[in-house]
Amino acid sequence: MANLKEKIKEMIVLNGPITVSQYMTLALTDPQFGYYQTQTPFGRAGDFITAPEISQLFGEMIGIWTLASWKAQGCPHPFILAEIGPGRGTLMDDILRTIQKLSQTAFNAAEIFLIEISKKLAKEQKKRLFSYQKQIHSIENFNQIPSNPLFLIANEFLDTLPINQYIKVNGEWKERRITVNQNGDFIFIAAPHKLPSSCLQTYCSKVPDGTIFEHAPLRHQFMQQISHHLVQVTGSALLIDYGACELAFGDTLQALSKHRFRDVFDAPGEHDLTSHVDFSFLKNIALEQGCFAEILEQGEFLFKMGLLERANQLGVGKSAPLQDKIRQDIERLASPDQMGKLFKVLHFSDKNISIPPQF
């Protein structure tokens, strides 16, 4: 078969229309044609740049959060420091450097686990972190995490988990599915599949026809698993992504390639596919599991952790161009009209521990 588009078309011809989540899963993880198997997504030469690759300041603030959370939990020894979807290892590199600089005791107590399904990226991560002379445990599933106190980070991971979409038609919710028209192009259709009962049926009944609602069962399962684990072993987690604090409607499925948005049906497997994260649902799941949970905008979080103070330190004695770059990086990470407002930070813990104070 020549490409993923033809493979998906054949599936639809044989089995009928597919769900949005099936389409996303194939586009991202198909063993032969999937995006994560065939493309190089990260960095300026890739399809997108994540916050850790904009500036070391981002990872340093996460490192401060980790250390402060560890102290708030009573300085457990040993403890698990884990990241889900570590990319090229840039964020964990900055976190470990920060912890090592501020507390050798915490650094020695940390056992590093990177949850990564790409063998190529896992090798790159280990190579990047080799200088710390710590064993790097590369695992593919959260279930492989030992039962020690856990401090977990996931940056721009949740947006990649598949979603299903529902559209209101003539007062009823129907599932959006994908089929092929007479011209051989992918199109959305409304299929007679009801909105799951867990999706706030009463609230959803108030919206007009044409409204789209996105449901992300894998995100919700992930949140239940992490929250339950934290209650059992103690610890804290930090999930960072773009999305809304409150329940939101609309089609947020998007394709990105070479830093530009593309048609989601154009060349599946060659573009990154993501959607906005439903943070209100995730927070409620954490609370139901017995965790403390709070949502902050990324800019607010970074300022709380000492972004400006650290930036001033970093700029001392540096050239004017480098100082300008630091200011530009802060603007991009924390400004409300860039990443500061769109990106949210969900912090949750087994104890009533709010976002720790800066050092």
Report residues per predicted region:
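Conserved RecA-like P-loop NTPase ATPase core
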Residues: 58, 152, 241
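Short, glycine/acidic-enriched loop or turn micro-motifs at the edges of active sites
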Residues: 119, 158, 244
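Generic recognition of stable, solvent-exposed alpha-helical segments in well-folded globular domains
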Residues: 3, 19-22, 53, 57, ...
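Short glycine-enriched loops at secondary-structure junctions
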Residues: 28-33, 193-194, 241-245
